[in-house]
C-alpha cells in the first residue's frame, strides 16, 4: 500500500496544488484493492436493535478516536487523545468534540447502536474537527465550523456507508 500511495500522492500534489489532500491518496489506493475483493458484497446490514451498555455509550467517542488508526478500543482512543493533547490541548478538544458530535449525529439519524459503540460514526467527524483546529485561527467561527463540519461529515458517512456498502460492496473509509 505505501509503495503505491507515494506516486498517487505525487500525482495528487501536481493536480491539487496547495489544496490539502488529507487521506485522498489512502482512499484511492485502498479502495482500488477493496474493489477487487468487495468484502461487503452480500453482507447483512447491522441489526439496529442491538443494544449496547451505558459504559459503551460513554466510551464510544474514545473508540471513535481509536478507529482513526483502525483500533476498536476506548483505552487506545484515550491514549491517542492524550498524545494529541500533549501536542495541542486545543487540537485534542476539537478531536473529542468531533467524535462526540459524530456519535450524536449517528444517534439522531438512527444508526445501529453497535456501529456507534464501535466508533464507526466518530472517526471521520473527529478528523474533520481536528483539521479545522489545525488550519483555522481559534475563535467562534472556527468552533462553529468544526461543529458543523463534524455533523456534516457524520451525515455524509451515514449515506456513503449505505451506498458504498450496499451498491459497491466496499466500506466508505475516510471519504466523507
List each language-model region with its residue ranges.
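C-terminal transmembrane helix-loop-helix hairpin of multi-pass membrane proteins
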Residues: 1-77, 90-176
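Alpha-helical transmembrane segments and their helix-helix packing motifs
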Residues: 84-87
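A short small-residue
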Residues: 80-81
